[in-house]
Amino acid sequence: MHRSRIGIVLVDHPGEHHDAALAFWAGVQGVRPSPDGPYASVGEIGSLNLEVQRLDEGQPRVHLDIESDDIPAEVARLEALGGTVLERRDGYVIMADPGGVVFCVVGIQTGDRFEEDAREWP
């Protein structure tokens, strides 16, 4: 058995747009951003974290992180639902839904909120 939940909404921007986008989303939320490497937290939406991510390359986009206490089990569950693994990286897996929308499966990142909201899967 394992647990998972959608935990993070990420607004991704390449470096040349990142600072302006970060200021914008922090303003939308009325918060001061909390940077952590390529990520910066700009508050919460209900029980979800909202973050702005600096991309090395690629187009601006929004993606979800599904956090799990067992990444391989969650990836297998999502593949059975029709998801596709695009890339396995150290500590997370990049996947796509049946329509091609990209998302990530990551370890637990939201602490107590994960414990409160995660669903348990067989």
Name the predicted role of every residue range.
Residues 1-49, 73-74, 86:
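Core segments of cupin and vicinal oxygen chelate
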Residues 1-4, 6-15, 42-44, 48, 53-77, 79-122, ...:
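Vicinal oxygen chelate
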Residues 1-22, 62-66, 109-122:
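N-terminal beta-strand motif that seeds the catalytic metal site of vicinal oxygen chelate
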